[in-house]
Amino acid sequence: MAKSHTLNPEEEFEEESGLRPSLLSEFIGQKEVLNNLTVYVQAAKNRKRALDHVLISGPPGLGKTTLAGIVSNELGTRLTITSAPVITKGADLARLLTSVGENEILFIDEIHTLHKKLEEILYPAMENYMIDLVIGEGVTAQMVQIPLKPFTLVGATTRSGLISEPLKSRFGIQLRLDYYNDEEMKEIVLRSSRILGVKIEDDAALEIGKRSRKTPRIANHLLKRIRDFSEVEGNLSVKKGLCLKAFEKMGIDDLGLDGMDRQILGCMIDRYKGGPVGLKAIAVVVGEEEKTIEDTYESFMVRIGLINRTPAGRVATEKAYRQLKRMQDFSENHGQDPTLF
């Protein structure tokens, strides 16, 4: 397996749990992405040249970092992992770029947060494997070109719209990860359970998958918690009934909504009659950062039809009222006869 080097792991990345797939053949779901990536990787191997630069976008927890590791393993090359928020100076980025060896991979997470001045250092690095540095100050300042070894930059982002067009256009390979379906989530849970040594029935794995917000990272977390409940009860295998009891105790409903999701929807319904309401107002009421609400909670609820984004603000849908069993409030907020519901 190719070696991996992580910068500031205590702040930016979870330790490898052994649950991440290490090869393309082990990755479940995202078929179109995998099929295309397999071709790109094989072509780079055949040419014995660096893979073109890769931009991977999509919601959190879908496998962006995992895919970077897989590409590294498939190519048999070293992977250096960092995150854009920890790169604050041009010298930091220059040190990173000059430390990357021939055909190696530099992975930058949250690349949309990279400062525009630092982006400008990346442009010649990505195009010509060269960085331009200014040495000295004032009239004695000189521009020095430092050659780099051919390398692959893999950028990951949850907000591709915030990446400048000049930077985005320099990624020859652009991949978008989407939420997983229930069957894919079930297979991910079954795979993880085998690695963890947890005996689990198919319908239990499906139940965990359905409540994991279509996100593998969450599925693995929930599987471990279900394992805790199962072991404490002395069960030999995980059954659906145990999962249902455990999820009720953890406050996770059949769509995967937790207490914060319900608090956000409740805020919209109780304080703003279902909306429209601005994200900032919601954040103040529930005591959470706007970015966290938008990336972690709202994006999923929009995807499954509980929240609509409109020019005037966020609106709770009829489905949201039904999920919270608050159709009486829906009829009152929308001036409809409650007997119809």
From Swiss-Prot:
Residues 181-251 are annotated as: Small ATPAse domain (RuvB-S). The keyword ATP-binding applies. DNA binds at R309, R314. It comes from the Bacteria. It is an enzyme of class 3 (hydrolase). Its EC number is 3.6.4.-. Residues 1-180 are annotated as: Large ATPase domain (RuvB-L). Keywords: ATP-binding, Cytoplasm, DNA damage, DNA recombination, DNA repair, DNA-binding, Hydrolase, Nucleotide-binding. PANTHER family: HOLLIDAY JUNCTION BRANCH MIGRATION COMPLEX SUBUNIT RUVB, PTHR42848. The RuvA-RuvB-RuvC complex processes Holliday junction (HJ) DNA during genetic recombination and DNA repair, while the RuvA-RuvB complex plays an important role in the rescue of blocked DNA replication forks via replication fork reversal (RFR). RuvA specifically binds to HJ cruciform DNA, conferring on it an open structure. The RuvB hexamer acts as an ATP-dependent pump, pulling dsDNA into and through the RuvAB complex. RuvB forms 2 homohexamers on either side of HJ DNA bound by 1 or 2 RuvA tetramers; 4 subunits per hexamer contact DNA at a time. Belongs to the RuvB family. This is Holliday junction branch migration complex subunit RuvB. It comes from Leptospira borgpetersenii serovar Hardjo-bovis (strain JB197).
